[in-house]
Amino acid sequence: HWNKGIMMPTILKETDHIILMPRCGRHILLGSSLGMKNAVGYWRTDSRLEYHKYASTIQEKTADANTVKTLRDKQRLVLTSGTKILTTFGPDKGFVVEPETGLVIASENIVAHDMVSLAWLIKNRFGMSEEEVKGSKDPYKKQFAVSTANRVVVKLLGGFGDALGAQKLVRNDLN
């Protein structure tokens, strides 16, 4: 799914163990920000640009990034504290739910972790009022908002020309 391959930092080759500590939260572009999405944080600008510009395969690229040998061989644990869940907007701001009983999610398997984390995110969204999730407070519900926000990211990474040529990012429902 990658035209130019994924560029990972050298430090990943130099380290012995990788422990991911992702949040359990909403994401304006991809719907959720869990463990697998953490791989994006390692990338150089050129890899991020390809990821967002050729958005028709963005979900597949997220999965591909987690199969890079360095990550696959060195990732030991994925650990999330589900005591505060970013239930709208994301990745940096939105409505935070603090459940009465929190949940700590830990797994050696990133897919298993993300399935539990996603279920926890969805469960905590069900208790929200309509006021907390309407309109611009949860833009992921609107296809126009998702594709426009992705073009803004492409513009920031590659410029106006790349933004004009960017593929449409299609949203997938979470709940």
State where each predicted segment sits.
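Extended, low-polarity segments enriched in aliphatic/aromatic residues
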Residues: 1-175
